[in-house]
């Protein structure tokens, strides 16, 4: 018996060694100047690994609750904004469907993200053969919550058509020190259509259309005021995108152009908002003197017509010209770029007597970005820097109805500096990253913010067992207009995500996310934790149970209740593939 046991252990060790050797040449991360790429296939995903599981591998913390992407990142698919219910989308899109994910933390020039926001750009695998495939997912959980999700992909030799549809219903109730009665209902409906057509070996046309409906009703009783509050929210959003690209020659020269139109209709209590936002851009990519030096040149025009009915109307017209150079030779990768923006802004009050609040401004601003990377074998060192002037978004200012006194000075360009030094080590089935970063931000009347921090992450894949862990520690210094004293905060975020593949189609996974402060307003710490068990029944059906909880749920504001109490739930669902 002892000899048989030793033989089994040796056999398992040999199999693990073979796996590690087979993965030796796979690199999960590759760096391309202003962004890094997650090569999803190099993660060797199992059939139930989701898009959110892949995003947990990111060195940056892209989620704090295991469900949604943090607000500083915009989700795109094929470099086009993707307007879907994030929670439903990230948990139902499987990693095996994806080719790669581009993460832009310094995308001010190429993506126009102005230093405040990053971009998560998802690319799907090309269908291996013409045909139709898809899946249907349904789930239900406590509080009467439920979701229905479906996606279908149809492909021929030159055309790929993909469609999504989902509906999500959430109920909630809670009691806190400030609120003795709180009930809410949220309904989300999404529909998405995309078409990719290879007109010729050098020409491609992509068309996308999105529709989103959101309805939210809240009933609460505030103890201090002894009042009942009813806050209905209604939102409808539409989006249409057309994108054309053409390969100009065999040296890598390419031209692409995109046109888009967005429409928003929002009712929040007595507040009514209308927003139309068309834009278009044209972009060239080509080698300059040598194939090692690639150049990108582009022009973009945006128009935003934003109405707060009965209060204010503001309009933007922006012309942007941008250029970026990327030099890649041997172990070196150097990127430098600049985006110049000339914008015109008009603000009009609906009250004829408020002439002092009518403004018209014209300004020139620019964003600068550079990075240097050096790679030797499995080691990579990269430094990135960006200096941006950005504009506050419309809703940051004009939804604050009491801020008329500040609006007469609006808009004022704001400054943000970002810099980061990062080290990455990739070997066989282990990926490790560490970075030091610093940012400085100043705006018209909100806090001046300085942040310095250190983050590290590790991903280990041993075949049947996968582990992702990370930590992010940073110090924040705030200087608020009107306050003599500065606000100092030391914050830490931790993540741990193990996955175990068992026999007979069982999969057990867990996600734990901790942060000692949910915001700089000293809200208490919390720990999000989930345990999920999947079971395959044949090749088409998967059934799962998922329990989620939050320890240390805050009770300071209703807003935090809205965002957090949904987690305390047991979810049972199934996915059928066809």
What is each stretch, according to the model?
Residues 170-190, 196-279, 403-404:
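Flexible loop and strand-edge segments within Gram-negative outer membrane beta-barrel domains
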Residues 230-247, 356-375, 379-461, 487-490, ...:
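Outer-membrane beta-barrel signature, preferentially recognizing the C-terminal barrel domain
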Residues 127-154, 179-184:
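Short strand-turn segments of transmembrane beta-barrel domains in outer membranes
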Residues 51-54, 88-89, 103, 113-137, ...:
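N-terminal periplasmic accessory domains that precede
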Residues 331, 426-518:
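Gram-negative outer-membrane beta-barrel transporters
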Residues 292-376, 380, 391-392:
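Signature of Gram-negative outer-membrane beta-barrel scaffolds
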Residues 80-107, 150:
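Short acidic/polar hinge/loop motifs at secondary-structure boundaries
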């Amino acid at each position: 018996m002892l000899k048989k046991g030793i033989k089994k252990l040796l056999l398992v060790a040999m199999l693990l060694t073979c796996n590690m050797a087979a993965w030796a040449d796979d690199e999960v991360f590759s760096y391309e100047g202003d962004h890094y790429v997650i090569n999803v296939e190099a993660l060797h995903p199992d059939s139930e690994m989701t898009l959110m599981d892949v995003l947990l591998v990111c060195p940056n913390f892209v989620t704090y609750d295991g469900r949604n992407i943090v607000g500083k990142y915009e989700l795109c698919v094929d470099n086009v904004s993707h307007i879907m219910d994030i929670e439903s989308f990230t948990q139902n899109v499987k990693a095996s469907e994806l080719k790669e994910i581009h993460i832009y933390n310094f995308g001010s020039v190429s993506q126009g993200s102005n230093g405040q926001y990053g971009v998560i750009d998802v690319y799907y695998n090309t269908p291996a053969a013409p045909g139709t495939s898809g899946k249907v997912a349904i789930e239900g959980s406590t509080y009467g919550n439920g979701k229905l999700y479906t996606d279908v992909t149809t492909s021929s030799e030159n055309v790929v058509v993909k469609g999504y549809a989902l509906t999500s219903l959430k109920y909630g109730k809670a009691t806190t020190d400030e609120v003795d009665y709180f009930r809410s209902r949220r309904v989300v409906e999404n529909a998405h259509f995309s078409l990719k057509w290879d007109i010729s070996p050098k020409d491609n046309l992509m068309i996308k259309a999105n529709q989103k409906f959101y309805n939210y009703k809240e009933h609460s009783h505030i103890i201090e005021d002894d009042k009942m509050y009813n806050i209905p929210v209604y939102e409808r959003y539409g989006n249409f995108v057309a994108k054309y690209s053409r390969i100009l020659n065999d040296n890598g020269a390419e031209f692409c152009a995109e046109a888009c139109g967005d429409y928003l209709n929002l009712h929040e209590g007595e507040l009514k908002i209308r927003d139309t936002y068309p834009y278009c851009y044209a972009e060239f990519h080509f080698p300059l003197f040598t194939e090692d030096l690639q150049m990108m040149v582009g022009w973009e025009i945006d128009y935003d017509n934003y109405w707060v009915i009965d209060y204010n109307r503001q309009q933007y017209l922006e012309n942007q010209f941008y250029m970026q150079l990327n030099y890649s030779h041997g172990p070196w990768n150097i990127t430098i770029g600049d985006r110049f923006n000339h914008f015109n802004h008009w603000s009009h009050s609906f009250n004829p007597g408020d002439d002092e609040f009518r403004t018209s401004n014209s300004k020139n601003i620019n964003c600068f970005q550079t990075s240097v990377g050096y790679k030797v074998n499995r080691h990579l060192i990269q430094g990135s820097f960006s200096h941006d002037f950005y504009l506050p978004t419309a809703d940051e200012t004009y939804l604050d109805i009491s801020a008329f006194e500040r609006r007469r000075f609006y808009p004022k360009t704001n400054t943000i500096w970002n810099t980061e030094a990062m080290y990455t080590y990739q070997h066989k089935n282990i990926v490790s990253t560490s970075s030091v970063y610093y940012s400085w931000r100043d705006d018209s009347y909100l806090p001046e913010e300085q942040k310095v921090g250190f983050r590290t992450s590790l991903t280990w894949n041993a075949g049947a067992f996968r582990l992702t862990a990370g930590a992010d520690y940073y110090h924040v210094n705030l200087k608020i207009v009107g306050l003599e004293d500065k606000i100092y905060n030391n914050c830490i975020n931790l993540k741990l995500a193990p996955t175990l593949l068992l026999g007979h189609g069982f999969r057990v996974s867990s996600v734990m996310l901790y942060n000692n402060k949910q915001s700089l307003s000293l809200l208490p710490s919390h720990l999000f934790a989930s345990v999920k068990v999947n079971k395959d029944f044949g090749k088409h059906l998967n059934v799962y149970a998922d329990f989620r909880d939050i320890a240390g749920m805050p009770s300071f504001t209703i807003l935090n209740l809205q965002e957090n109490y949904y987690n305390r739930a047991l979810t049972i669902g199934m996915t059928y593939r066809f």
